[in-house]
């Protein structure tokens, strides 16, 4: 069952032409357990997984014991709801539902991925964080972000002389809408991807967004 799911997943990735999304799955420590209908199953605690993810269909009687080294629990967040999930003592971030009314002000603040800067992402700082990453025109490496591998800043459609990625209002609205849709998919609609578990995954997601936005902006020029 798990093998079939992985085959489907990589076919989905290939169809969507977002190869980088595999980084959100490979290298993530989680346990996925498929439970068939009308069964009674006991899941023993995991010792090396960061959390346990279980798909539970209807008409199923299941007992799930707590994980011994869980960093956090993932909670389903309904639509049109802004909910903060407080991080546990061993977690370095909080997952926050992103509302539909994300606004951007002129008092733009550069986002730092230093883990000591903040232990949580709010919707607006998360939104600004990706924009700041994509708008980076310097020669920084991932070492500057507490990481080890070098990377090339993605600056295809962004201006270095302004805090806004693009000055045109129409394009700016398209970009904001795309951010909301993509982030909602990763954070709310699809709990199979443990996003923002670390900052390397965060930067990879930013690169995915940049690719999507480049296509959208080119089509609307």
Curated annotation (Swiss-Prot):
Disulfide bonds: none annotated. Keywords: Late protein, Repeat. Induction: Expressed in the late phase of the viral replicative cycle. It comes from African swine fever virus (isolate Tick/Malawi/Lil 20-1/1983). This is Late protein I196L. The keyword Repeat applies. The lineage of its organism: Viruses, Varidnaviria, Bamfordvirae, Nucleocytoviricota, Pokkesviricetes. Belongs to the asfivirus I196L family. It comes from the Viruses. Sequence repeats lie at residues 28-48, 49-69, 70-90, 91-112.
């Amino acid at each position: 069952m798990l093998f079939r799911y992985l085959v489907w997943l990589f076919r989905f990735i290939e169809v969507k032409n977002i190869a980088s999304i595999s980084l959100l799955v490979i290298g993530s420590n989680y346990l996925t357990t498929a439970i068939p209908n009308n069964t009674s199953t006991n899941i023993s605690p995991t010792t090396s997984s960061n959390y346990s993810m279980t798909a539970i269909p209807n008409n199923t009687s299941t007992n799930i014991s707590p994980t011994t080294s869980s960093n956090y629990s993932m909670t389903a967040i309904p639509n049109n709801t802004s909910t903060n999930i407080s991080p546990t003592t061993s977690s370095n971030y909080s997952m926050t539902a992103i509302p539909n009314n994300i606004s951007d002000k002129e008092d733009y603040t550069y986002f730092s991925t230093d883990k000591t800067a903040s232990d949580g992402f709010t919707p607006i700082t998360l939104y600004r964080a990706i924009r700041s990453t994509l708008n980076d025109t310097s020669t920084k490496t991932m070492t500057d972000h507490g990481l080890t591998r070098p990377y090339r800043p993605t600056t295809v459609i962004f201006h270095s002389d302004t805090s806004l990625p693009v000055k045109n209002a129409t394009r700016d609205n398209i970009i904001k809408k795309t951010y909301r849709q993509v982030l909602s998919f990763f954070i709310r609609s699809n709990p199979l991807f443990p996003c923002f578990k670390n900052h390397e995954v965060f930067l990879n997601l930013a690169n995915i967004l940049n690719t999507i936005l480049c296509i959208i902006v080119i089509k609307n020029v």
